[in-house]
């Protein structure tokens, strides 16, 4: 496997860099500082685009328009204008207000709904979800890079893919991890005796923090504002956060044990 990055699809160019809470650890993901968004009036309800293939242009400042294609994975219940999108050739999951963001141009629905893929080994899938892992990637000149992270969940729509995040870069990625596991590139780390596995409570997770606004102070003293948009069922102390100035989805443990 290649080191996680944001490989550009055909006709795509790197978007402008935005402020980050953490270093990118030699990653080349696309970043941007978001500007104010305003809704566009609509006389009728918009169609459900979750599961659809989409394409659109992207216009950032004075940069030339670039073209993007991807799959809409989910619509965020706490903020229905926000969609999670897996773009072709990009390892990260992006969060964008597709109908409101003025940088999104000529949004087109390419297909009504993609056929849901199936996992080859349901038992193995259940085994890796919620686990701390070591994920091996091929670095420069054939070297091996080891990334420690956590498998968060099976991705929606694209069921053969899994959400994962890393200690080096706590944003939301997705990969076909069962293939990596079978090829020896994904290894489940032994559970620490000091931190017993979290048991899932019956009836799902408590979502008391979902929808809450959070403030993050960066190393330079500047602050960024975001919203908690999702709680990870397999690890209830772990949440997804969408910051106003970035379209990446950040993954943080908000209930750190002292």
Swiss-Prot record:
Tissue spec: Detected in all the examined tissues with highest expression in liver, followed by heart, stomach, kidney, skeletal muscle, placenta, and pancreas.
Pfam families: Spin-Ssty
Site (Histone H3K4me3 and H3R8me2a binding): 169, 176, 180
Region entry Disordered, spans: 1-49
Keywords on record: Apoptosis, Cell cycle, Nucleus
Tudor-like domain 2: annotated segments: 129-178
Chain intervals with Low complexity compositional bias: 1-23
Main location: nucleus
Ranges for region Histone H3K4me3 and H3R8me2a binding: 138, 246-248
Sequence ranges of Basic residues compositional bias: 28-39
GO BP term (any one): apoptotic process
InterPro entries, sorted: SPIN/Ssty, SPIN/Ssty_sf
Segments of this protein annotated with the region Tudor-like domain 3: 210-255
Location within or outside the cell: Nucleus
Region described as Tudor-like domain 1: 50-99
An example molecular function term from Gene Ontology annotations: histone H3K4me3 reader activity
Keyword Nucleus belongs to the record: yes
GO cellular component: cytosol; nucleoplasm
Homology family: Belongs to the SPIN/STSY family.
Other comment: Overexpression in murine myeloid cell line 32Dcl3 causes G2/M arrest.
Binding partners and assembly: Interacts with C11orf84/SPINDOC.
Function field: Involved in the regulation of cell cycle progression, this activity is related to the inhibition of apoptosis following the removal of essential growth factors. Exhibits H3K4me3-binding activity.
Name by which UniProt lists this protein: Spindlin-2B
Native species: Homo sapiens (Human)
Gene behind the chain: SPIN2B
């Amino acid at each position: 496997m290649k080191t996680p990055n944001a490989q550009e699809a055909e006709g795509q160019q790197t978007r402008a860099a935005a402020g980050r809470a953490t270093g990118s650890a030699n990653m080349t993901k696309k970043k941007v500082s978001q500007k104010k968004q305003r809704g566009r009036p609509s006389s009728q309800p918009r169609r459900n685009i979750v599961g659809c293939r989409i394409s659109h242009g992207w216009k950032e400042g004075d940069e030339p328009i670039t073209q993007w294609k991807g799959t809409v994975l989910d619509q965020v219940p706490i903020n229905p204008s926000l969609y999670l999108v897996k773009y072709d050739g990009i390892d990260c999951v992006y969060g964008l207000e597709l109908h409101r963001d003025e940088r999104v141009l000529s949004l087109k629905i390419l297909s009504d709904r993609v056929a849901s893929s199936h996992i080859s080994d349901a038992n193995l899938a259940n085994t890796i979800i919620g686990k701390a892992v070591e994920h091996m990637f091929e670095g420069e000149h054939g070297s091996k890079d080891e990334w420690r992270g956590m498998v968060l969940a099976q991705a929606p729509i694209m069921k053969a893919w899994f959400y994962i995040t890393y200690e080096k870069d706590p944003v939301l990625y997705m990969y076909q991890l069962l293939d990596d596991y079978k090829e020896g590139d994904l290894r489940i780390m032994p559970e620490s005796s000091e931190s017993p596995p979290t048991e899932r409570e019956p009836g799902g997770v408590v979502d008391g923090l979902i929808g809450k606004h959070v403030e993050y102070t960066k190393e330079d003293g500047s602050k960024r504002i975001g919203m908690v948009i999702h709680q990870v069922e397999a690890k209830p102390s772990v949440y997804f956060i969408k910051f106003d100035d970035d379209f990446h989805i950040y993954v943080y443990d908000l209930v750190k044990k002292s």
